[in-house]
Amino acid sequence: MDHIIGFMGTTNMSHNTNLMIAAAATTTTTSSSSSSSSGGSGTNQLSRYENQKRRDWNTFGQYLRNHRPPLSLSRCSGAHVLEFLRYLDQFGKTKVHTHLCPFFGHPNPPAPCACPLRQAWGSLDALIGRLRAAFEENGGSPETNPFGARAVRLYLREVRDSQAKARGISYEKKKRKRPPPPLPPAQPAISSSPN
């Protein structure tokens, strides 16, 4: 994760883009609790997921336009997606302890520390999932989807593992509880008394 710290000072974005992406990062890490002011649900209303996906897609499009030199979506690669994720990382709200911190590996540290705030792995993973879907919905083919690139998957795995160690929590998938096997059909009671 040290390569992220080095990236923070070297960004190609303008101040307005920084503010716009900071706002997008905030909406990515916090859940939207707003609902429609009209009491009923209309047929044209999008779900929270669809709205967030649209905002994320627009934010990434703005990132591409403000990139120096500007990038077209067709030229975007997994490396550009990683650059975007590393840039968003500085707007995170999750404390990730460094190896030198006395609270490294403690899920509930007893005191504050100077460790950096990062985007939580779950937020980054969800963001990439939404952008991956949006790319294909906007005409991109699954084979050329930069959000599904191997480098992006490896980066997310690295973030997950390093945050799990630093924060002392597990990101293991919860095992599904299997339903109990069906009981054999009940057989009718046979009466042994004569009629």
Curated annotation (Swiss-Prot):
Pfam families: ALOG_dom. It is found in: Nucleus. A motif (Nuclear localization signal) lies at residues 173-177. Residues 48-175 form the ALOG domain. It comes from the Eukaryota. Keywords: Developmental protein, DNA-binding, Nucleus, Transcription, Transcription regulation. Induced by NAC054/CUC1 and NAC098/CUC2 in shoot organ boundary cells. One of its GO terms (molecular function) is DNA binding. Residues 28-51, 162-195 are annotated as: Disordered. Its main location: nucleus. One of its GO terms (cellular component) is nucleus. GO terms for biological process: mRNA transcription; post-embryonic plant morphogenesis. Residues 28-38 have a biased composition (Low complexity). Disulfide bonds: none annotated. Belongs to the plant homeotic and developmental regulators ALOG protein family. Probable transcription regulator that acts as a developmental regulator by promoting cell growth in response to light. May suppress organ differentiation in the boundary region. PANTHER family: PROTEIN G1-LIKE2, PROTEIN LIGHT-DEPENDENT SHORT HYPOCOTYLS 4. This is Protein LIGHT-DEPENDENT SHORT HYPOCOTYLS 4.
